[in-house]
Amino acid sequence: VKMTWILGFLLLSIALGLPDLAIGQQIASGSEADVDVTPDVVYGRKDGMALTFDVFRPSNAHGGAVLYMVSGGWVSRWTPPEWLIAWSFGGLLEKGLTVLAVRHGSAPRYKVPEAEADVRRALRYIRLHSEELGIDEDRLGVFGGSAGGHLSLMLGLGSDDGVMGSNDEILRTAARVAAVVAYYPPVDLRAIVGPSERFPALDFAEEKAASISPILFASPDDPPTLLIHGDADMLVNMENSKVMFEALQGEGVESELIIIPGGDHGFRLPADRERAQQAMVEWFDRHLRR
């Protein structure tokens, strides 16, 4: 499918009545590059269901790519591709970055450890098939917000060289990225694991929490990591990003923490969204452009 991403934004704005989206300002002043969209690429299956991602490749693609974690409360919903272009990806596409929107098995059926395993498999698949996807496996970034930010940090900080001896070619492939951006991420699941009506994905065995808590994975070989958090976030306290930043700094990792004054969870104010989006795009452009 080929479409002009400005048109996608206009359709979204009309449908939702959102003319002041921060990304819309970027589109209005940007080029009219075409985007090739390949939806529903299958990277695995579980319980008879396909695990998929969508590929958004701009006409000015240079090989760098960003995996977007489609996750809120560790629920991964399908969204029309043209909406994603307008809502989240315009600035990245304008910079020549290919974007891959990765979905995982969702709560309440699947819990956080399973969601993390899904997106890790997606990363391995993407690296294994990087040539046919038209991207450079050594110039991959990952980003997301909230639960998606948590998963992004796990992929970035919990990298591995693959499961040696596995019969699965995908599992034998390394899971590594070159840059991370996380908006308002929970970083220590040990404190919040257990039965939860609002977040059923957290209802899993307590002893597994440490293995999916990014705060425990900071190490000197971690990729450049940008954290963005609002100081008025009432859902995921800003301390999450602060302690994560301190841990990364302590290991000598290139990292930055942006605190948005008055920013809430989700950056609902257009100015907050614009600041976060601009910082995210600049971070990936700096670290993924050859």
Tell where the protein language model's regions lie, with residue ranges:
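N-terminal cap/lid segment of alpha/beta-hydrolase-fold proteins
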Residues: Q26-A61
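Active-site nucleophile elbow and catalytic-triad environment of alpha/beta-hydrolase enzymes
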Residues: S166-N167, D203-F217, D222-P223
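Serine-hydrolase catalytic-loop signature spanning alpha/beta hydrolases and amidase-signature enzymes
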Residues: G73-S76, P80, V99, Y125
